[in-house]
Each structure stands twice: as structure tokens, then as C-alpha cells.
């Protein structure tokens, strides 16, 4: 089963001085909220029979690829609600926030650092998930209501 995480985004491993939450850039939100109507629509796809399951939760964004359980555990200590870790979502969320554009981040969970066969989990991902990812994204976009 492929999991897709989407929803709120929080930067991690950035300290921007006193008066800011860990990961918060001065003058900007600590957490970028996903657009509620887009999130609701995305979650409704779970009822369509898609092969992929969609989950909503916090995405922790950083500046490196996480390859081991120690790094993942450190992130989870800072952000216990974290569903996924990536390197892109916060930058996209911040840009959308600054320009007033509705935001939602679809993330495919490609691997879980620290589990047995982590490397093959990641390698197998590229051969099996492209089509399913496209189908999920296409279904999401093609079924968006006109009023969004």
C-alpha cells in the first residue's frame, strides 16, 4: 500500500532566534496550514477505490535526506505529530502563504529510515509508485469541484 501524506507543514532544524518557535522563520507562521477545502477533497478520494490511501498530518521539512532511525527519532522528538519528512513542502507552503495561494502538499512515503531493508524499500519505490502517484494526482485534479 502506498501512503500519501498531506496537510500542514512545519520547518525543522532551523533556529531563528528568541521569540520564535523551533523551525519558525521570523515574521512567518510556525506551521503552514493546508487549505481546508482542498484537504477535504483529497481525503474524500479514499472513498473512490483508489489503490493508494491518503492520510492527513504534519509534514516536517528539512535540508537533508533522512537515512537512519537516529535522525528520524530526533525529528519525532521535536515534532511528535509528524507524519512525513521531506525537503520541499515548507518552501512551497511559504511561497503560497506569501502570495495568498491555496496550498496542499501531496507526499508519497517512499521509505522508512531504520527499518529492515530500508535501501531496497527506497529502490523499489521508483519502479512501482510512479503510475499510482500519477493516478492519485490526476484523480484529485480531475474531480476538483468548480467552486474551489
Predicted regions located by residue number:
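Zn-dependent metallopeptidase/amidohydrolase metal-coordination segment
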Residues: 92-124
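Generic detector of well-ordered alpha-helical packing
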Residues: 2, 87-89, 112
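Single conserved hydrophobic/aromatic residue that forms the stacking wall/gate
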Residues: 1-10
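Conserved active-site and cofactor/substrate-binding residues in soluble primary-metabolism enzymes
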Residues: 33, 37, 70, 87-90, ...
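Active-site rim beta-loop-alpha module in soluble metabolic enzymes
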Residues: 15-84, 99
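His/Asp/Glu-rich mid-to-C-terminal helical/loop segments that flank catalytic regions of hydrolases
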Residues: 113-148
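Predominant activation on well-ordered alpha-helical scaffold segments within soluble catalytic domains
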Residues: 43, 90-93, 97, 134-138
Amino acid at each position: 500500500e502506498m501512503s500519501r501524506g498531506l496537510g500542514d507543514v512545519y520547518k525543522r532544524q532551523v533556529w531563528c532566534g528568541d521569540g520564535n518557535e523551533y523551525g519558525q522563520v521570523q515574521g512567518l507562521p510556525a506551521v503552514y496550514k493546508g487549505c481546508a477545502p482542498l484537504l477535504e477533497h483529497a481525503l474524500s478520494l479514499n472513498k473512490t477505490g483508489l489503490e493508494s490511501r491518503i492520510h492527513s498530518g504534519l509534514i516536517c521539512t528539512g535540508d537533508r535526506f533522512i537515512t537512519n532511525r537516529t535522525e528520524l527519532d530526533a525529528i519525532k522528538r521535536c515534532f511528535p505529530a509528524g507524519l512525513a519528512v521531506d525537503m520541499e513542502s515548507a518552501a512551497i507552503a511559504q511561497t503560497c502563504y506569501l502570495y495568498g495561494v491555496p496550498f496542499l502538499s501531496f507526499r508519497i512515503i517512499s521509505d522508512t529510515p531504520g527499518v529492515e531493508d530500508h535501501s531496497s524499500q527506497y529502490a523499489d519505490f521508483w519502479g512501482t509508485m510512479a503510475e499510482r502517484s500519477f493516478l492519485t494526482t490526476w484523480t484529485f485534479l480531475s474531480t476538483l469541484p468548480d467552486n474551489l
